[in-house]
Amino acid sequence: MSQEAILEKVRSIVAEQLSVEAGEVKPDSNFQNDLGADSLDTVELVMALEEAFDIEIPDEAAEGIATVGDAVKYIEEKQS
């Protein structure tokens, strides 16, 4: 899956999970600071990404995923 395809899928999931417009979800968008996620939203978002991409994101790795771009990069690495 290309980086662009991953970004589009992540953007769609983030928009749905956080009830924001997909246009607001940019690679440098911080889940908490820019998109209004709280800690529970972040946990639910990680679970949705795990399911959508059929990967496992350990807690230690999840703590390092603060932006949409971080999520895309992590998923890209897991799929290569």
Swiss-Prot record:
The keyword Cell cycle does not apply. GO terms for molecular function: acyl binding; acyl carrier activity; phosphopantetheine binding. One of its GO terms (biological process) is lipid A biosynthetic process. Pathway: Lipid metabolism; fatty acid biosynthesis. PROSITE patterns: CARRIER (PS50075), PHOSPHOPANTETHEINE (PS00012). Keywords: Cytoplasm, Fatty acid biosynthesis, Fatty acid metabolism, Lipid biosynthesis, Lipid metabolism, Phosphopantetheine, Phosphoprotein. Residues 4-79 form the Carrier domain. Pfam families: PP-binding (PF00550). 4'-phosphopantetheine is transferred from CoA to a specific serine of apo-ACP by AcpS. This modification is essential for activity because fatty acids are bound in thioester linkage to the sulfhydryl of the prosthetic group. GO terms for cellular component: cytosol; membrane. It is found in: Cytoplasm. Signal peptide: none annotated. InterPro entries: ACP (IPR003231), ACP-like_sf (IPR036736), PKS_PP-bd (IPR020806), PP-bd_ACP (IPR009081), Ppantetheine_attach_site (IPR006162). The keyword Lipid metabolism applies. Its main location: cytoplasm. The modification O-(pantetheine 4'-phosphoryl)serine is found at S39. HAMAP family: Acyl_carrier. Belongs to the acyl carrier protein (ACP) family. This is Acyl carrier protein. It comes from Prochlorococcus marinus (strain NATL2A). The lineage of its organism: Bacteria, Bacillati, Cyanobacteriota, Cyanophyceae, Synechococcales. The gene is acpP.
